[in-house]
Amino acid sequence: MIIYRDCISQDEMFSDIYKIREVANGLCLEVEGKMVTRTEGQIDDSLIGGNASAEGPEGEGTEATVITGVDIVINHHLQETSFTKESYKKYIKDYMKAIKARLEEHKPERVKPFMTGAAEQIKHILANFKNYQFFVGENMNPDGMVALLDFREDGVTPYMIFFKDGLEIEKC
């Protein structure tokens, strides 16, 4: 299995269990997810022991929480955040500087294509700003990557967009 981590925060962003494709001329990875409903905290009554009818009225016992959301977000503990268009512009400017500095250090040949492609991609993001939900890694590092969540034209299929150069690949 391959885990994709944010290179700044080291948070796990997604893994290769999803359908992943390169978009924006290889600048971004688009990861397709599914809407899921999960029950958390539910414990099988047979594991508790005792006779439920002899214990008195129901009410005590275990509580279950039902969570509905995008599987990528739930599985990798991504945290929703919000931006105004202006605050996103400020964030993305600082984020691009951080990624550019990292590329200059590790992959200098990627700097020019990244900066050229990023400018185009940011224009596209800002033009469709109202369509996106924003997610950060589990540690909520404000300097880390912000993933974008949108839905396909069918209105049902969620997908997330990640800047490829902001990710590190870890093989498990």
From Swiss-Prot:
Where is it localised? Cytoplasm
Q: Does the keyword Calcium apply?
A: yes
Enumerate the GO terms in the molecular function aspect. Answer: calcium ion binding
Enumerate the spans annotated as TCTP domain.
1-172
Supply the InterPro entries for this chain.
Mss4-like_sf (IPR011057), Mss4/transl-control_tumour (IPR011323), TCTP (IPR034737), Translation_control_tumour_CS (IPR018103), Translational_control_tumour_p (IPR018105)
**What keywords appear on the UniProt entry?**
Calcium, Cytoplasm, Phosphoprotein
Query: What is one term from the GO cellular component aspect held by the record?
Result: cytoplasm
Q: Which residues carry this modification: Phosphoserine?
A: 46
Query: Where is this chain primarily localised?
Result: cytoplasm
Read off the Pfam families from this record: TCTP
Query: Is Cytoplasm tagged as a keyword?
Result: yes
Task: Tell me the protein family, please.
Answer: Belongs to the TCTP family.
Q: What is this protein called?
A: Translationally-controlled tumor protein homolog
Organism encoding this protein = Gallus gallus (Chicken)
Name of the gene this protein is made from = TPT1
